[in-house]
Amino acid sequence: MKTAVIASLIAGAAAFAPAKNAARTSVATNMAFEDELGAQPPLGFFDPLGLVADGDQEKFDRLRYVEIKHGRISMLAVVGYLVQEAGVRLPGTIDYSGKTFAEIPSLAAFKEIPAGGLVQLLFFIGVLESSVMRDLTGEAEFVGDFRNGAIDFGWDTFDEETQFKKRAIELNQGRAAQMGILALMVHEQLGVSLLPQ
């Protein structure tokens, strides 16, 4: 009882103690990115590790590029994961021993795929990184714009505000997909069914 009384007295006294002034430098440097794409409610600009606390725009753009790329890959991964979990598989065999695609499990696929198949996957990823998923023509209007003057799908018909809104939607969906694919992998490791039976 004495301990509870003493603790409440200390807490009460602490309420009236002068507050320590917060450093203003981090707030001032982060204000440079408050209006950037992705600084959206409810969090606003969120940089808990202080990766861009120095206000370096080039570093911010590089991190944004990486975030967009990982978000896009994660969105594809979630869809692919759910499609194969629903039982949709490629026909045929994966190797000469007769192992079918249907026999290969989701996460354990890396253990089941032959070494030659993994080399092909890595080569394909390298081709994408070096020749497809980048601004090859210098025509990019924003970070992550990989149209390269060839693909439009009506993007240029939108006004600037709509384009910004759609880019923000893509960024948020990518963030959610990154969490989603991680959750799907955890569920599989726990042995939890991903789809309703």
Curated annotation (Swiss-Prot):
UniProt family annotation: Belongs to the fucoxanthin chlorophyll protein family.
Gene3D superfamilies on file: Chlorophyll a/b binding protein domain (1.10.3460.10)
Species the sequence originates in: Phaeodactylum tricornutum
Membrane topology (UniProt): Multi-pass membrane protein
InterPro entries attached to this UniProt entry: Chloro_AB-bd_pln, Chloroa_b-bind
One cellular component (GO) term of this entry: chloroplast thylakoid membrane
Keyword Ribosomal protein attached: no
One GO biological process term: photosynthesis, light harvesting
Protein name: Fucoxanthin-chlorophyll a-c binding protein D, chloroplastic
SUPFAM superfamilies: Chlorophyll a-b binding protein
Record field: transmembrane: 73-94, 114-133, 174-196
Main function: The light-harvesting complex (LHC) functions as a light receptor, it captures and delivers excitation energy to photosystems with which it is closely associated. Energy is transferred from the carotenoid and chlorophyll C (or B) to chlorophyll A and the photosynthetic reaction centers where it is used to synthesize ATP and reducing power.
Pfam families: Chloroa_b-bind
Transit peptide stretch: 1-31
